[in-house]
Amino acid sequence: MRAIAFFLCAIVVVSPLSAQQQVITDLPEVRGPFTLTAVYDSAAGHNAFAYAGKTVPPVIRVLPGRVIKLRYANNLPRKSDEECATGRCGNVSNLHFHGLHVSPERPQDDVLTMMSMPGEILEYKVVVPSYSPPGLYWYHTHPHGESARQDLDGMSGAIVVEGDASRLVVESSMKHERMVCVSKRSP
């Protein structure tokens, strides 16, 4: 059976949660340099992002023309019992900054050669262009062959490029930000 993933950050209607699901009403936010860690969450039984002692990915907030400085530590186990697209998963990992018009070169958004094996660290310095429109973007793992499993586990988060959104918002009642991030992996 195929695993099904769902990641969405938007205004949505959410059905009641089962006893095992949880709603986190205050997502952590970061505006400056920070460390994000890939870990195995034994309580949840899958891989996750860890930030500030919790397995909840932070919302990255940035202004156009600024730099996202991020240290990404791969603390995933060296061995995995799961199968990936190319065989046994090796828990290699990296990050992709989806939707941002940024350089595909190191140390920005190089998803092809910038990889970390378990125990390794990657340093990202992502320059958000000054012409970037305000809006909602996202980051997620992107190692080809393994990203589906990692993304299905919830190894993704939101990026908010801040700025003057008045030209984008017509109704004054819509000027209040509401963000819902949903991520789900079926067994």
Residue positions per predicted region:
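N-terminal, post-signal-peptide metal-ligating segments of extracellular/periplasmic oxidoreductases
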Residues: 17-116, 121-123, 170, 176, ...
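Beta-strand-rich extracellular modules
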Residues: 73-75, 142-146
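Extended, polar beta-sheet/loop recognition surfaces of beta-rich domains
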Residues: 149-179
